[in-house]
Amino acid sequence: QRKLGIQRIVIDPLSIRDLDALLVTQVHHDHLDLNVAAAILQNVDKDIPFIGPKYVTDQWMAWGVPRERCVTVRPGDVIQVGDIEITVTDSFDRTALITDCPGEPPVSDTDVPDMADRSVSYVVKTSAGTIYHGGDSHFSTSFSEQGKAFDIDVALLAYAENPPSIQDKMTSSDILRAAEALDCRVVIPLHWDIWSN
């Protein structure tokens, strides 16, 4: 990736000192990190909320985050953090459906788990504009519902050119279709690749 001019940005969890809330979209550990949770508990003076779907908050509590600081969310929930309004929306991360979660039996071919327990997306309304964070959502025609429901300025979407026989993130074509469906002004690609690459 270096020869493509792509630079990975790594956040030092120990440098986090001032934060209003921690939002996590899903249970995968490239999103949900023990070191980040521990650093926030140790270094941030405020008792900020840890916000995420059920399996995310379950994991935080297993790591020692106090139950009263964990806010379990589902699509349709609206949370106010200071002057910022956060609306929880559906996730379209099919990979989250086949991920084993702590304390749960392995996923079977016959029982489809509840996506909302595993993965969500967020619409964050600020005084500067509205941000949509799709987590690791794959392309879905349902993006158009979210585009109609919210005036989205910036969309954060998971991007990767998938190798043959694997679809883990949105391709460049999917990102374009998602941006059109969300009717957003700017797209910022996240993830930028998949683990097999």
Residue ranges of predicted features:
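Active-site-proximal beta-strand elements of phosphoester/diester hydrolases
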Residues: 1, 85-91, 130-136, 156
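Pre-active-site segment of Zn-dependent metallo-hydrolases
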Residues: 1-27, 34-43, 95-112, 139-149
